[in-house]
Swiss-Prot record:
It is found in: Membrane. Residues 1-20, 102-127 are annotated as: Disordered. This is Putative transmembrane protein 183BP. The lineage of its organism: Eukaryota, Metazoa, Chordata, Craniata, Vertebrata. Belongs to the TMEM183 family. The chain crosses the membrane at residues 300-320.
Length: 376
């Protein structure tokens, strides 16, 4: 028998008060235990008001108990879906929760399966070693490599790099580009190339005499460089000498030569290790002038130069001379290298000023005008 309203028309104390518009509905555990059901627990509730669009299991169980208590049915007789189904479609609260759990499990399984396949594919790629061809094949292919492509060829694999270390490779390269009309120094002639000592360095030097693409590179060497060379910074001065040049001019010119050893690229990158040629080919790769270069400055007058051998070259500038007709070269030497872009004071170090300057040239160790020992 239904109970009527309380005295004076006031609502019953157990009546559920509806929340104000715009406030979020929060689920509390004691509300579920007491069998309290709100609009937010249904599937067609406003998602802007409800924090999550998914019905929690605790809420679904509370709804089931509420339906059972209202209908007076046992749990084993009537399913909750039938009790909740009215004139319209059923609100599949429990099914929606189970379906979402199943979907999440399927997504998780697919993600794990995809990761396993990706890992298995990566292991298969790592395990695939490929074909390893014998050294004779690479030596045969090296006979068709241009001199400017030797570096790219050596980077193909370790066997290709090993081939470029052999004496046979450099000897064949020399014979392939040698011509009878080539004007070569005594050390670079065929009768001297039978020596294995410094064979690689001598072949590279000879290519700048015989190979046209290499010779064209050094032919475009202006008397005064367009920009001040920056590769000599922190180089060590190994040797210094000057000589008198008698030419068409009434007064002779003077040539000042500074031999530098550049800072090793391994020291710049702080890399002490690296590929070393095989022991049996160390004599072939020996080069006393490795990382060396020659700075040659020609002046119109003789200029006294202080002793700078053994010092570190830290500053190099080329400016216009005071007469606006020639150039002025300033060299600064220090006892130790300068790192971190630290600027030097004008009074620090040993300064060498050459003025007026006729020409400034920089020669690497493979340049034809670089002086090298005949014993190399």
């Amino acid at each position: 028998m239904a109970r009527g309203p309380g005295p004076l028309g006031r609502p019953r104390p157990d009546t559920v008060a509806m929340p104000k518009r715009g406030k979020r509905l929060k689920f509390r555990a004691h509300d579920a235990c007491s069998g309290r059901v709100t609009v937010a627990d249904y599937a067609d509730s406003d998602l802007a008001v409800v924090r999550s669009g998914r019905v929690k299991k605790a809420v679904a169980n509370a709804v089931r108990q509420e339906v059972k208590s209202l209908c007076g049915l046992e749990a084993s007789q009537v399913p909750a879906e039938e009790a909740l189904s009215g004139a319209g479609e059923p609100y599949d609260i429990i099914d929606s929760s189970d379906e979402m759990d199943a979907q999440e499990e399927n997504i998780h399984e697919r993600t794990v399966s995809r990761k396993k396949k990706s890992k298995r594919h990566k292991e298969e790629l790592d395990g695939a070693g490929g074909e390893e061809y014998p050294m004779d094949i690479w030596l045969l292919l090296a006979s068709y490599i241009r001199p400017e492509d030797i570096v790219n060829f050596s980077l193909i694999c370790k066997n290709a790099w090993t081939v470029t270390c052999t004496a046979a490779f450099w000897t064949r390269l020399y014979r392939r580009h040698y011509t009878l009309d080539a004007s070569l120094p005594l050390r670079l002639r065929p009768e001297s190339m039978e020596k294995l000592h410094c064979l690689r360095a001598c072949v590279i030097r000879s290519l700048y005499h015989m190979y046209e693409p290499f010779a064209a590179r050094i032919s475009k060497n202006p008397a005064i460089p367009e920009s001040t060379p920056s590769t000599l910074k922190n180089s060590k001065c190994l040797l210094f000498w000057c000589r008198k040049i008698v030419g068409n001019r009434q007064e002779p010119m003077w040539e000042f030569n500074f031999k530098f050893k550049k800072q090793s690229p391994r020291l710049k990158s702080k890399c002490t290790g690296g590929l070393q040629p095989p022991v049996q080919y160390e004599d072939v790769h020996t080069n006393p002038d490795q990382d060396c270069c020659l700075l040659q400055v020609t002046t119109l007058n003789f200029i006294f130069i202080p002793i700078v051998m053994g010092m570190i070259f830290t500053l190099f500038t080329i400016n216009v001379s005071t007469d606006m007709r020639h150039h002025r070269v300033r060299l600064v030497f220090q006892d130790s290298p300068v790192h971190g872009g630290r600027k030097l004071r004008s009074e620090q170090g040993v300064q060498v000023i050459l003025d007026p300057v006729h020409s400034v040239r920089l020669f690497d160790w493979w340049h034809p005008q670089y002086p090298f020992s005949l014993r190399a």
